[in-house]
Amino acid sequence: MLRVAVPNKGALSEPATEILAEAGYRRRTDPKDLTVVDPVNRVEFFFLRPKDIAIYVGSGDLDFGITGRDLVHDSDASVCERLALGFGSSSFRYAGPAGRDWTTSDLAGKRIATAYSNLVRKDLVAKGIEATVIRLDGAVEISVQLGVADVIADVVGSGRTLSLHDLVAFGEPLCDSEAVLIERGDRGSLDHHETVAARDQLVARVQGVVFGQQYLMLDYDCPRSVLDKATLITSGLESPTIAPLAEPGWVAIRALVPRRDINGIMDELAAIGAKAILASDIRFCRF
């Protein structure tokens, strides 16, 4: 049976649970449950702290896990990133008191508070900077105000929390993060045929859900005279579906397009004379 770790709390927990449910896996009925067995799909889910998931997967105790890329990098665990899941986006950055033009060279000799000490130490070594790293388990933003640290290194989303504590982010991100599906680096426990089949099924299903969230189905009519231009705009995955219309000189086109680009694509199609442009949500897509 495949063993998969899922965040038990935090910003990644609910979206991770939802994406697995959309992929056809059993939900837990009680938020206090730490394990859920899905016998139909041959998977057992373990609900763990997000910070611990990469360690469990890397040690070989679990086969897969969903956690943040920043947590994976900080763990130094022997895991492989299998899929980016498209939620939980953030960046990991240094931040210091507002009112000063900070650069990363200013970190030399400073006290840096963070919950991601391994990630910060690796970055400092790469930059050739000597500084003191102070490990805290949370609420690192207050450490500067309390005099525990000079600067911090933390996950930054909207930046609102930094502003509340009069801090400003600086330098390039140490890591651009989002939720990822990770797999143990050593696949020794996956030699059994049924386990391999469950693994491949999990990856394909989750990938299908993620793809469905990132793409839309676009249908439209256009003059045959601009067909070449239209298919350049909407090339689809392999190629668009094209069918003749009853109206002479017109065709109907269907293609998958990236959700993030939909408005610009519709503008381009309208500009070349396309009509009845319809974008529809899709739930799953295998490719």
From Swiss-Prot:
Give the keywords, sorted. Amino-acid biosynthesis, ATP-binding, Cytoplasm, Glycosyltransferase, Histidine biosynthesis, Magnesium, Metal-binding, Nucleotide-binding, Transferase
Record pathway: Amino-acid biosynthesis; L-histidine biosynthesis; L-histidine from 5-phospho-alpha-D-ribose 1-diphosphate: step 1/9
Which ranges does the record mark as transmembrane? none
Q: Which GO terms describe its molecular function?
A: ATP binding; ATP phosphoribosyltransferase activity; magnesium ion binding
What Gene3D superfamilies does the record tag this protein with? 3.30.70.120, Periplasmic binding protein-like II (3.40.190.10)
Q: Which Pfam families match?
A: HisG, HisG_C
- Subunit relationships: Equilibrium between an active dimeric form, an inactive hexameric form and higher aggregates. Interconversion between the various forms is largely reversible and is influenced by the natural substrates and inhibitors of the enzyme.
Instruction: Please give the HAMAP family that the UniProt record associates with this protein.
Output: HisG_Long
Protein name, UniProt field: ATP phosphoribosyltransferase
**Taxonomic source organism:** Mycobacterium leprae (strain TN)
Identify the coding gene. Answer: hisG
